[in-house]
Amino acid sequence: MKTRIGVFFGGRSTEHEISVLSALQAINAFNKDKYEITPIYITKQGKWFSGKALLDVSNYKNMEALQKVCEEVYMIPEYGDYNLYKKHKPMFGSAVLTTLDVVIPVLHGSNGEDGIFEGVLETIGIPYAGCNTLASANGMDKITMKMVMQSSGIPIVDYVWFTDKQWYTQREKLIAEIEEKIGYPVIVKPANLGSSVGISHADNREELIAKVEVAEQYSTRIVIEDMVEDLKEINCSVLGDCDDYRPSVCEEPIKSGDILTYEDKYMGGSKSAKGMQASQKRIPADLCPEDTERIQFLAGETFRVLSCHGVARIDFIIDRKTGKIYVNEINTIPGSLSFYLWEASGIPFDKLMDTLMNLALKRKRESGMKTVSYDQNIFNLGKGIKGGKTGIK
């Protein structure tokens, strides 16, 4: 019997289209002799749809027409109910479209990669691939991520963070702190977005103020980082769980300017988006053996201290002047699932998907061994509860 996989993608996110591309790549990679795949597309308005038409990327040009030929679906947040239901129940026949065995979220950015969707899956209790709620939330929030890494001895660049309200009430104080602790130039980032969305750099106070206003359009919390001017960017993926993980080969993305942009990552110099694998890169990266070993070690440590699971990609900065290596950030659901890094490491895409499914089922088995509730009902203990007939105080 085939394992029934639900692939969720799209979502209420600025990285919506990239999620679609990553998901279609993953769906195509699954061994259809072993798996029965159900695509579940989440619109930008948060509605869920399923249907074969979702498998053709050209259909996404006309969303209204696409939704008309697909089935609107939903799941019930009830533990143990793995059914995918039809929203518009037929007069005759089953209201259940299919029953899932495992879910793989291929959702990038907000409302999917940040722990929110993972929390829904935890509530249902269905096995799923990738990071859990805690790791996803920590990985998405750049501030929390930096705090965890810094406390664990993982090297990161100097930074300052603040909320949008603090910026309006304490602007001069914050600017003074930034100029004293970091100095220009700086990188300005929204705290909770990926794919380089909303990121820019500032060379002076005037530019800083303008760039913070841009970042505020995407997040209520802003991060200001020391900008390494003469840098080399390196990425390394990690596959496994906290007990058993391995790093991939390293890659060096090729950027068109000071910052690796959304276009650099996903357009690859072409006029049409093709996913993360389309970006221009060197694989393996041009590194000395010592730097390669150091980056792979730090990638694994970052994966471990953030309690990651499945496949993730850790992005690094090397200061060419000093040779220092810094962890920039982690992507807990990386673009294209970093399959191109694993192919270069000797693991084909279909085997990568096998590994993710096996890891999901392993975690479910292990979590089932933990105590989450007691069979004993304390309401039957009588004297153990204050209040008696009048209720609990």
Regions found by a protein language model. Name each.
Residues I37, P127-Y128, I156, V186, ...:
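Hydrophobic beta-strand scaffold residues
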Residues D203-G275, D286-D291, F297, I325:
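Phosphate-binding site of ATP-dependent enzymes
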